C-alpha cells in the first residue's frame, strides 16, 4: 500500500508538473501551424577590425533573426541570448566542413560564438530541445540558416 501511494503521488506530480510545458508546447505549435513564423534576414557587415558581427535572440520556438548572411573566410562573432521564459533552448550548427560547428545552450546573458566560415553555402541552425515525447523545437519552427556568400 505504501508503494501505491508513493507511485500515485509521483504520477500526479509528473502530470501536473508537465502541464505548463505542454501548454507552452501546444501554443508554440499552433502559432507555427498558422504561419506566423517568417524569415528575418540579417546581413553581417565587416567591422573596422575585420570581424563580422551579428546579434540574435532565441526564445519560445524562434530565433530573431533566423537567417544570417556572412562572407566566406572572414571571422564571425555571433552574440546570442535567450529571451525571458523557463523553456530551455540551444543553438546548433553542424557544418564542420565549412568551419561552422557549435552547440550552445542559451542563457539570459549574451554569449558569443566565434567561427570563420570556409565554404560558400547555406547551413542550418536549430534547437534540438524537446520535452518528453513532444516535438523538438526544430520541428516547431525553431530553426534558421547561416548563408555564406562570396
Set out the residue ranges of the language-model regions.
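Beta-strand-rich interaction surfaces with strong enrichment in secreted/lumenal proteins
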Residues: 65-68, 100-105, 113-115
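Bacterial N-terminal signal peptides
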Residues: 9-18
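N-terminal edge beta-strand
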Residues: 44-75
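Extracellular/periplasmic metallocenter environments
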Residues: 29-49, 54, 105-150
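Boundary at the C-terminal end of the N-terminal hydrophobic targeting segment
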Residues: 21-25
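Non-cytosolic beta-sheet module surface loops
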Residues: 58-60, 80-84, 117
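Histidine- and aromatic-enriched segments that form or immediately flank copper-ligand environments
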Residues: 83-107, 134-139
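Bacterial N-terminal signal peptides that target proteins for export
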Residues: 1-8
Amino acid at each position: 500500500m505504501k508503494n501505491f501511494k508513493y507511485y500515485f503521488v509521483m504520477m500526479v506530480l509528473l502530470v501536473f508538473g508537465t502541464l505548463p510545458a505542454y501548454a507552452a508546447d501546444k501554443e508554440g505549435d499552433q502559432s507555427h501551424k498558422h504561419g506566423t513564423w517568417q524569415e528575418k534576414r540579417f546581413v553581417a557587415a565587416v567591422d573596422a577590425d575585420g570581424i563580422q558581427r551579428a546579434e540574435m535572440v532565441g526564445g519560445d520556438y524562434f530565433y530573431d533573426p533566423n537567417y544570417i548572411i556572412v562572407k566566406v573566410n572572414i571571422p564571425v562573432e555571433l552574440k546570442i541570448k535567450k529571451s525571458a521564459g523557463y523553456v530551455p533552448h540551444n543553438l546548433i550548427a553542424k557544418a564542420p566542413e565549412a568551419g561552422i560547428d557549435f552547440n550552445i545552450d542559451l542563457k539570459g546573458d549574451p554569449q558569443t560564438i566565434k567561427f570563420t566560415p570556409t565554404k560558400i553555402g547555406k547551413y542550418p541552425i536549430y534547437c534540438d530541445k524537446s520535452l518528453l515525447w513532444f516535438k523538438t523545437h526544430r520541428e516547431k519552427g525553431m530553426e534558421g540558416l547561416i548563408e555564406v556568400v562570396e
